[in-house]
Amino acid sequence: TPENVMPFSALAYFFAKDVYQKTKVPVGIINSSVGGSPVEAWISEEGLKPFPYYLNEKRIYESDDLVESMKKEERSHAWNVALCQGDKGMHEATPWYAADYDDSNWTETDLFTSGWATNGLNTVNGSHWFRKDFQVSAQQAGEKATLRLGCIVDADSVYVNGTFVGTVSYQYPPRIYTIPAGLLKAGKNTITIRLFSYGGRPQFVKEKPYKILFGKGQPEKGESEINLEGSWKYHLGAPMPAAPGQTAFHYKPTGLYNAMIAPLLNYTVSGVIWYQGESNVSRRNEYKDLLTAMISDWRQRWNKSDMPFYIIELADFLSPTDKGGRTAWAEFRKAQAEVADTNKNVTLIKNSDLGEWNDIHPLDKKTLGQRVAAAILIEMNTKNRK
């Protein structure tokens, strides 16, 4: 429904929609996905038998005592508590996000310069605060408004005129915040961003939209917008050491298979759309074997030896100057192609041309979904002719 579709897979939605529009046959889709997951987490213990390294890792984490001890040792909660306690912006008499806060002694900066993110020698983790005043007309103040803040590394909380309007806890999602009706007023308004840096790369991602959109967000149709690039006020809130890492136990071998595939085996499944790989690029030399093992494993579990798999090619990513990184991604795409070439009923869906150099999760899932739909419809028509 329109109310619950947003957290769902955009690729799966557009694929199913396109198939339905062309066939008038409803398509049932199951979304079983976890961002950032490695392929070995999606393979059963039986399927991992050819990979003793991963089987051994799996058995290590079978110990409840080990898992509990690791959870107790990990300090991420303590790090966040220390950050909140030490953040001056939250504890002054007038908090830094307040509409009437006096930021006249703050530093002028540009969001995309690196000067604010460093102490001269190293990047600074912790909290960084930004404020910007902007003018709104009486007409704009009465319209629906959406705040676009590109992508931010790592996390953020955002306020408009002292009112909290949204937060994202990690770097990848586009920042799209609704400004509640009545919050903007004719004349001067203020946006405050509290940016959190965990791992030494605080930044606002370049070449993304930083603006306020009014109405339906269609400036090409005459609706207004306010550009938020340019000068901002800046102040460091709380410098911190790098945040301690956390162990993603569900990423361990067999973890996601047991939790998210095994419970689905009683469903009748016609095929699989497989969009994964970024987390395996550093181990690309083994990916062909691992993905082939996963395909065979799932086919055995569903007792369908020819169950179709549609592998989504990894999208283009990284700056043109990052030769090493781009080479690694190209080699990974080659491994994906080899899986499709050497396994029956496995199709590679082109996606590299839909990538964005500055976004590991490119936004155009509609075109990609239509490509998957086209591949499946071709296969259906071929079978029908037989």
Specify the residue positions occupied by each region the protein language model found.
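Substrate-gating cap/lid alpha-helix
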Residues: I30, L314-S352
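Loop/turn elements at helix/coil->beta-strand transitions in domains of secreted/extracellular proteins
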Residues: T23-G28, K188, Y267-G271, K304-Y310, ...
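Surface beta-strand/loop "capping" patches
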Residues: L121-N125, W129, Q135, A141-T146, ...
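An acidic-aromatic loop/edge-strand motif
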Residues: T1, I30-T118, K188-N258, L264-Y267
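Aromatic-lined ligand-binding clefts that engage carbohydrates, nucleic acids, or primary amines
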Residues: W106, F134-G162, I191-I193
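Alpha-helical scaffolding within the catalytic cores
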Residues: P174-R175, H250-P263, D289-D297, T327-A337
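Extracellular beta-rich ligand/substrate-recognition surface
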Residues: A117-W129, V165-Y172, F249-H250
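Beta-strand-rich ligand-recognition modules
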Residues: C151, V158-K211
